[in-house]
Design a protein with these regions (language model features):
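Juxtamembrane "helix exit" motif at the C-terminal ends of alpha-helical transmembrane segments
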Residues: 75-79, 116-141, 216-240, 244-247, ...
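Short, charged cytosolic
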Residues: 26-27, 35-37, 61, 65-98, ...
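Cytosolic juxtamembrane amphipathic/interface segments immediately preceding
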Residues: 1, 5, 10-11, 46-52, ...
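Divalent-cation
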Residues: 1-81
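Residue-level signature of transmembrane alpha-helical entry/exit and packing/kink sites
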Residues: 105, 109, 113, 145-153, ...
Length: 339
């Protein structure tokens, strides 16, 4: 499997795809038509060399993905807002426009991302620490306490994902998430990008954000087993300060998993892919069409696969010496070749 380097995320009734600094958003409008927007996003650090260093690039990319995600989600939601609500800005919006002028949108975006990061740290890093403290009377070993803390952290994360997946709107978003993964898998496995080929591709992918967050949880257990401080206040501070480091390590793991095809990385990636059973669902053909439109707006998959324009879309690309068309993959289970 050849890595394409593209990635994306689901938005409201659509998909965002990013290829280097170029990104596209494809949305299924209420009238049934597909609206596609393309633009450039250079990132918070631009082309600075330090932002590309191992560990540092993980946190930078995480923040960039949140900013771009908020921006594209807002754009997709605009197609489903009431005309009256869209036409009349509220008092708070008027206040921000008066205070910050043209930079108001960027200020709101930055504040939203900052608030999201703070809430994530509180819920997934500090809350498990305080809850694990309830076991200090019964558990003397700091190693066991760190493991208990990690288990609580993963439990909160899994419960959160499971709860929101039961919401109707979120379920449709997860279906678009599945369509995004299917398109990338279709391309990277050498198949022409068509509805038929995308439909039979796997909805699980090693470079998924769900896998990244799960790996963050696992790595945090390892870190807190070996990094110990006596003061309770210092423990809280250490957990906050280590968030960028843990995120950086998790990013490097996901990056390696996305580029490597050896059995060890496949096995290590399995738990994260298992989490994708909650955050991805099988899309319908309309959703797949939206995903294809998003991909083709920023990525030349034909050039990537070395295909000619006249080659038929629905014929899978055969490997050298292969004469039979491969059987379709199973849709609802994770197979070894999907790892």
């Amino acid at each position: 499997m050849k890595p394409s380097g593209i990635g994306g995320q689901a938005v409201l009734e659509g998909i965002m795809m990013k290829n280097k600094s170029q990104y596209s958003v494809a949305v299924r409008r209420p009238d049934g038509e597909i609206e596609v927007k393309t633009d450039e996003y250079v990132g918070i650090a631009g082309d600075k060399a330090w932002a590309k260093l191992p560990l540092i690039r993980g946190m930078v990319n995480f923040i960039d993905s949140m900013i771009l995600g908020m921006k594209t989600l807002s754009w997709s939601a605009s197609f489903y807002e009431d005309e009256e609500e869209e036409a009349k800005p509220g008092k708070f919006e008027k206040f921000l426009l008066k205070l910050f002028g043209e930079k108001a949108e960027k200020v709101v975006m930055g504040a939203t991302v900052a608030f999201s990061v703070i809430m994530a740290v509180l819920i997934f890093m500090l809350l498990p620490y305080f809850l694990s403290g309830l076991f200090r009377k019964f558990i003397v070993s700091n190693t066991l306490l760190a493991i208990v803390e990690g288990c609580i952290r993963m439990g909160i994360f899994i419960l959160y994902v499971a709860l929101i997946s039961s919401m109707k709107d979120i379920r449709r978003t997860y279906m678009y998430h599945g369509a995004e993964h299917k398109c990338i898998n279709c391309i990277e496995r050498g198949r022409a990008l068509s509805v038929r080929n995308v439909r039979k591709s796997s909805r699980y992918h090693a470079r998924c954000g769900t896998s990244f967050l799960f790996i963050v949880m696992v790595i945090s257990i390892i870190f807190f087993i070996f990094i110990r401080v006596e003061s309770p206040v210092a423990r809280v501070i250490v957990r906050v300060l280590l968030v960028p480091v843990i995120a950086g390590v998790a990013y490097e793991f996901i990056r390696l998993a996305g580029r490597s095809n050896n059995i060890v990385m496949r096995i290590l990636s399995l738990p994260g892919k298992g989490m994708q059973m909650l955050t991805t669902k099988e899309p319908d053909d309309d959703m797949i069409e939206v995903a294809i439109a998003a991909v083709e707006a920023v990525f030349d998959w034909r050039a990537f696969q070395g295909l000619k324009e006249e080659e038929p879309l629905d014929m899978p690309k055969l490997e050298s010496g292969q004469t039979d068309v491969p059987e379709p993959e199973e849709l609802d289970e994770i197979k070894i070749e999907d790892l």
